[in-house]
Curated annotation (Swiss-Prot):
Quaternary structure note: Homotetramer.
Reactions listed under catalytic activity: Release of an N-terminal pyroglutamyl group from a polypeptide, the second amino acid generally not being Pro
CDD domains reported for this sequence: Peptidase_C15
EC id: 3.4.19.3
Catalytic residue positions: E78, C141, H165
GO BP terms in the entry: proteolysis
Gene: pcp2
Species the sequence originates in: Caldanaerobacter subterraneus subsp. tengcongensis (strain DSM 15242 / JCM 11007 / NBRC 100824 / MB4) (Thermoanaerobacter tengcongensis)
UniProt keyword annotation of Glycosyltransferase present: no
Superkingdom as given in the UniProt entry: Bacteria
One Pfam entry name: Peptidase_C15
Record's protein name: Pyrrolidone-carboxylate peptidase 2
Presence of keyword Iron: no
HAMAP family hit by this protein: Pyrrolid_peptidase
Lineage, broadest ranks: Bacteria, Bacillati, Bacillota, Clostridia, Thermoanaerobacterales
Length: 206
């Protein structure tokens, strides 16, 4: 069994992206599943292209994408991706789409196909705050989640997929008073816990 995990490079003036720091620290094997790791650029369309290339290469049982959501307090397991780009800031190559469909012929939205409620409950059992989020935003994170689910749907692939937003790391909020953060250790434990739930779910549906 293979689980593909994606993370982003830094964006918006940050020198690090916690999603990539978490990715680098994940175990290579979790519950018997090989963990395939890839960093994708914080760039509209190119992020999806890179993820799809890897999906074609490794044929994973599930894809879990991780992204930074500065200002959030907890591990946010996303429920839905919507078919719109509406960028508050430019991406890493200067693109800033406003009110633009990701795929003009795609569905209005796709729900995550990983077990989001079980993931939240298991993370909480590790004494790490977590919740279901009903919006992944309209920036590159939502774009990637939608793009992956859209690709899976259109090609009728038996691959589960979802997205988890994580807070800033403490080092990122040194000059951001009152902005929440979470330790790298807790975030790694949370994502590995989520992967365990996903692996169990994939085994059940085989």
């Amino acid at each position: 069994m293979k689980i593909l995990v994606t993370a982003f490079d830094p964006f918006g003036g940050e020198s690090i992206n916690p999603s990539y720091e978490v990715l680098k620290n994940l175990k290579d094997n979790i519950e018997g599943a090989e963990i395939v790791k890839i960093q994708v650029p914080t760039v509209f369309y190119l992020s999806v292209e890179k993820a799809i290339e890897k999906i074609k290469e490794v044929n994973p049982d599930a894809v879990l994408s991780i992204g930074q959501a500065g200002g959030r307090y907890d591990i946010s397991v996303e429920r839905v991706a919507i078919n719109i780009d509406d960028a508050r800031i430019p991406d890493n190559i200067g693109q800033q789409p406003i009110d633009t469909p990701i795929d003009p012929e795609g569905a209005p939205a796709y729900f995550a196909t990983i077990p989001i409620k079980e993931i939240v409950e298991e993370i909480k059992k590790e004494n790490i705050p977590a919740s279901i989020s009903n919006t992944a935003g309209t920036y590159v994170c939502n774009h990637l989640m939608y793009g992956i689910l859209n690709y899976i749907h259109k090609n009728k692939l038996n691959i589960k997929a979802g997205f988890i937003h994580i807070p800033y790391l403490p080092v990122q909020v040194l000059n951001k008073p009152s902005t929440p953060s979470m330790s790298l250790g807790d975030m790694v434990k949370a994502i590995e816990t989520a992967i365990k739930v996903i692996v169990k779910s994939c085994k059940k549906s085989r």
